[in-house]
């Protein structure tokens, strides 16, 4: 919850935000067949308000510069030209959370890489062990640029109906032959084909007979190859 405040979430919204994600995240996992029996949520303010944690925040700050914090937070926090101090505290607390949550691994998108490196470099200076850091690619937005929470057309929201999802994908930017910044292809690669592989299923691209009829793919790489060669296109 407190991390949200450090990244400009209004204080009055924090508790509602926490309850929302606590309710939604298990449903996401269940929708793809994950057993959530051992899933546990830890509220940040339950341990981040304790004296020892705050002391470590101060201690951590003596090992890093303002520029170190700015660099670490640059792809995650909305800093702007005149950043608030809160945004510079953010990477310090995210790093310390590894120790205070006693985790073996921290997982995040590739936009988190600078904070993850920051944690690995600085935690040992406080006498804490570095953790394993795992990153996965971010899916580009559906309008040909980075996905943005402020632009509903650029993303598929957790609360979107089936009709909304179909409408957004139907109106997505999908330049023929181009793979870079193609949100539709990324959605296929990292989500659809992953689910198909887990279920030992093939992906069927439905087409009218006048366009060659249906095409079946066992893997994403073959689909991408055909897309680049414009054998298939929007």
Which ranges hold each PLM region?
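Poly-acidic low-complexity segments
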Residues: 1, 35, 40-43, 157, ...
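RNase H catalytic domain
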Residues: 1-8
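Generic signal for short, ordered secondary-structure residues
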Residues: 4, 71-72, 148, 167
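Short, flexible active-site loop motifs that bind/organize anionic cofactors or intermediates
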Residues: 4, 105, 155
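Short low-complexity, flexible loop/linker segments enriched in glycine and/or proline
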Residues: 9-12, 147
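Divalent-metal (Mg2+/Mn2+/Ca2+)-assisted nucleotide/phosphate chemistry catalytic cores
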Residues: 11-135
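Conserved nucleotide- and phosphate/pyrophosphate-binding catalytic cores
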Residues: 95, 101, 113-234
């Amino acid at each position: 919850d407190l991390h949200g405040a450090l990244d400009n979430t209004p204080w009055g919204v924090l508790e509602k935000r926490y309850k929302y994600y606590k309710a939604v995240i298990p449903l996401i996992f269940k929708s793809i067949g994950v057993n959530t029996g051992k899933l546990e949520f830890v509220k940040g303010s339950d341990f981040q308000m304790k004296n020892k944690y705050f002391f470590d925040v101060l201690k951590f700050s003596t090992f890093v510069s303002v520029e170190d914090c700015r660099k670490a937070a640059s792809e995650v926090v909305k800093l702007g030209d005149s950043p608030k101090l809160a945004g510079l505290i953010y990477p310090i607390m995210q790093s310390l959370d590894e120790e205070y949550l006693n985790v073996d691994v921290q997982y995040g998108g590739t936009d988190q890489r600078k904070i993850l490196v920051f944690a690995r470099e600085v935690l040992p200076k406080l006498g804490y062990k570095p953790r394993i850091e795992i990153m996965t690619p971010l899916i580009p937005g559906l309008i040909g640029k980075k996905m943005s929470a402020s632009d509903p057309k650029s993303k598929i929201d957790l609360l979107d109906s089936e009709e909304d999802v179909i409408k957004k994908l139907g109106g997505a930017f999908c330049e023929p032959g181009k793979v870079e910044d193609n949100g539709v292809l990324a959605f296929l690669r990292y989500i659809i084909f992953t689910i198909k592989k887990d279920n030992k299923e093939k992906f069927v691209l439905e087409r009218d007979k006048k366009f060659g009829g249906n095409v079946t793919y066992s893997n994403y790489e073959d689909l991408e190859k055909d897309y680049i060669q414009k054998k298939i296109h929007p």
